[in-house]
Amino acid sequence: MVNHVDRNTTLCVSLAARPSNHGVRFHNWLYAELGLNFFYKAIAPTNIEQAVAGIRGLDIRGAGVSMPYKAAVIPLIDHVDPSAARIQAVNTIVNDGGVLTGYNTDYSAISELLASHSVDTDLRVAVRGSGGMAKAVVAAITDYGMGGTVVARNAETGVELAEQYGWAYSPEFPTDAQMLVNVTPLGMAGTDEKVQSFSDEEIGRADV
């Protein structure tokens, strides 16, 4: 963790309606491991326009962005990277000398992961979940040339996500899935592991 903060410390923040300590602990631990004089602070903004203006005004180096602000920050920043433009959702803002650029690192990470492992585009995919990260994952998989099924208990968001990218929707796990991606809040407090995880049988039938 951070041992001290001084006038040379570079500040990064997260903007979230309900900030948690998970990201704070991880970022500050990683800064310490890398020997960086950075400090990460979670913030629940009362006014998102003023919060984004504060990134510029206070020379904050970057910001993580969570719901419900991922779309709201887009008109407030200077540039939107293709990763964020694709799904109209920003999860990271980088401040370069007062110029704010928005990225979606979920989309970028999945895209790079698929390409670096040369994943077979013929594999049928099952994505469990239909929230904000699921949208980034489904978009990245679609752009890679793959398709499949959105598996979600919430029929409204599940159907909407599936239709947007030309996927199937099912509340139940499809038997033909060869690649599994779990983007539920599995592992977080209050989640149901039995409902949100893939079964041993489902994992056993899959290739990836």
Where are these regions (language model features)?
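Glycine-rich adenosine-cofactor-binding loop
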Residues: 102-107, 114-143, 152
